[in-house]
Curated annotation (Swiss-Prot):
Cofactor: Zn(2+)
Organism: Lactobacillus johnsonii (strain CNCM I-12250 / La1 / NCC 533)
Free-text remark on how the cofactor is bound: Binds 1 zinc ion.
Protein family per UniProt: Belongs to the endoribonuclease YbeY family.
EC number of this enzyme: 3.1.-.-
Protein name according to UniProt: Endoribonuclease YbeY
GO biological process: rRNA processing
Keywords, sorted A to Z: Cytoplasm, Endonuclease, Hydrolase, Metal-binding, Nuclease, Ribosome biogenesis, rRNA processing, Zinc
């Protein structure tokens, strides 16, 4: 079983403002990431598309950063006992609520221009990055960053989304 149940909340009409089938695109990309990190059980999560103003407020309130950002992850497992979670993680019938992503398409678009990556690539990068955070990956320490950005890079390449040249060396983060 390799299911990923995603609830979408679109406050900025991102999903409707395009001819692209973003829901399928997002689901397939995240299923690729899920497979790469060897999650066998069903996962559920929410993806919230919000304005620059809204993500700025969230970033300030929960992260103490007074600026808009591209993605904020609220992982359910943060603070939960690791042994408790691991006892169920290999059970294919266990449905794991991994948390909520808040994405700001406006900031992602700005980053795609700034980093010259193109919107689809930048959106995919941001989406996989947030998903990995929901699954306990981090990039505070160098060894953690190497693992996280390595997975992120592999998933993006396999999905046909090119890495920024600065990321080719061990999946280094450019922003």
């Amino acid at each position: 079983m390799n299911n990923l149940d995603i609830s979408f909340n679109d406050e900025v009409n991102f999903l409707k403002d395009s001819d692209k089938d973003w829901i399928t695109w997002i689901s397939n990309l995240l299923l690729s990431a899920k497979k790469e990190i060897h999650k066998e059980n069903t996962q559920e999560m929410s993806i919230n598309f919000v304005s620059s103003k809204k993500i700025h407020e969230i970033n300030k309130k929960y992260r103490g950063k007074d600026r808009p950002t591209d993605v904020i992850s609220f992982a359910i497992e943060d603070g939960l006992d690791e042994d408790f979670i691991s006892a169920f993680s290999d059970d294919p019938d266990f449905v794991e609520d991994i948390g909520d992503l808040f994405l700001c398409p406006e900031v992602i678009k700005r980053h795609s221009v700034e980093y010259e990556t193109g919107f689809n690539r930048e959106f995919g990068y941001t989406l996989v990055h947030g998903y990995l955070h929901l699954n306990g990956y981090d990039h505070i320490e160098d060894d953690e960053a190497k693992v996280m950005f390595g997975i992120q890079g592999k998933v993006l390449r396999e999905y046909g989304l090119p890495l920024h040249p600065d990321q080719e060396n061990h999946g280094k983060q450019i922003h």
